[in-house]
């Protein structure tokens, strides 16, 4: 079994309450804990690349994510990422064609009892093991082509598009 590389970048997935005013900040990643709770036996390695809200990610951050992926021998990569700019990062990675790359995130923090984080991480693990090389986004119970998906903020969900969305 090929080892899956799991990169954490922050986002709502890893947000925690910061103070009594209900302000959130990105905390230490809970991905390893979630994988342990789910009794995942597939070999994987978790690497924290950064701890940022995805609205704070810039081209240099995307270049760093890209360089980590390209430097790794792993052919299967899962990335936990904030949902607001996940599609931007997907487009920035789209020309990496010899690996299976799956981005996922959460609409509420993984530390919350009612969260989609665990489900989305499970979807990402399934997709990364069964998909052809390319870049994908798993959210809302669906595996999307990273070039043919948008986040619909009015629905708080991801939706497929017929045509590729512009590359970065």
Q: Where in the sequence are the language-model features?
A:
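Active-site histidine-anchored catalytic micro-motif
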Residues: 1-168
């Amino acid at each position: 079994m090929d080892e899956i590389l799991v990169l954490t970048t922050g986002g709502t997935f890893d947000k925690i309450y910061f103070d009594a005013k209900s302000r959130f900040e990105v905390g230490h990643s809970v991905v390893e804990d979630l994988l342990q709770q789910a009794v995942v036996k597939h070999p994987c390695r978790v690497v924290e690349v950064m701890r940022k809200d995805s609205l704070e990610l810039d081209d240099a951050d995307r270049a760093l994510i890209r360089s980590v992926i390209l430097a790794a021998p792993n052919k299967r990569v899962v990335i936990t990422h904030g949902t607001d700019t996940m599609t931007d990062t997907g487009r920035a990675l789209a020309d990496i064609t010899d690996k299976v790359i799956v981005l996922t995130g959460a609409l509420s923090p993984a530390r919350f009892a009612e969260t989609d984080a665990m489900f989305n991480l499970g979807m990402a693990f399934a997709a990364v093991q069964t998909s052809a090389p390319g870049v994908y986004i798993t959210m809302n119970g669906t595996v999307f082509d990273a070039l043919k998906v948008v986040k619909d903020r009015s629905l708080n969900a991801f939706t497929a598009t017929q045509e590729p969305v512009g590359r970065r």
